[in-house]
Amino acid sequence: MRVMGKVAVCIFFLVAPLLAQVRFVTGAPPAAATGPVFEASAGYSYLALDTLSRQRVGLSGVDANGFVDFNSRWGMMVDSSYARVGNVLGTGHSGNVLSFLTGPVFYPAEYGNTRIFVHTLAGVSLVNSAVPVSGTYYLGGAVTRFSYALGGGVERTVSGPLAIRVGGDYLRTTFANSTAAMQFQNNLRIVTSIVFRFGRR
């Protein structure tokens, strides 16, 4: 729950400047009928990886997304991310997390060129990491399991089809403990990306 609290704080500080002037799209008149709007994005990802020793390991990497906005409120996204660190908890073993997720996106409010989004994603994540066992011994390897993410953020159009997205997620993954039993990991992910929009929303 501490991780969920951190995600909530991050999202609050991202959207707080908009709340005094926000316009809820549910009260807006319907726009003229248009087809779906496609978007693609790429950017930087930071992952605070939960370990079984309750220490967090910071991983850095890249994130790429594809979006389809069906209307002003709802869309779908496909998310792929890769983050890496050279040394996990002093074991000398590198660590990385590769995720492929998809799910719905909801846009509850917008103001001018800025809109707020929330999403629920599910898919698989591969976690390659290590767990200290005793002394200089450690258990290392890769685990691929079901994974999901809950989060949101802010998107702002900067010029023509270009926009900037900043968001945060609670990301649930799985890795082994020192006895090789599978355990859940509660991770925090922050993503900053450039968005290119194919069409007008």
Residue spans for each PLM region:
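Extracellular loop and loop/strand-boundary signature of outer-membrane beta-barrel proteins
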Residues: L49-L52, N87-G92, V133-G140, A176-M182
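N-terminal secretory signal peptides that target proteins for export/translocation
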Residues: M1-M4
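Extracellular beta-propeller repeat domains
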Residues: A163-R165
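Internal, hydrophobic beta-strand segments that form the core of beta-sheet-rich folds
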Residues: G168-D169
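Bacterial N-terminal signal peptides
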Residues: K6-P17
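Gram-negative (and chloroplast) outer-membrane scaffold detector with strong preference
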Residues: N65-T136, V143-Y148, R156, G160, ...
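Short, surface-exposed tryptophan/glycine-enriched loops
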Residues: G153
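Short glycine/proline- and aromatic-enriched beta-strand/turn motifs that initiate or cap beta-hairpins
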Residues: A20-F70, M76, Y82, A122, ...
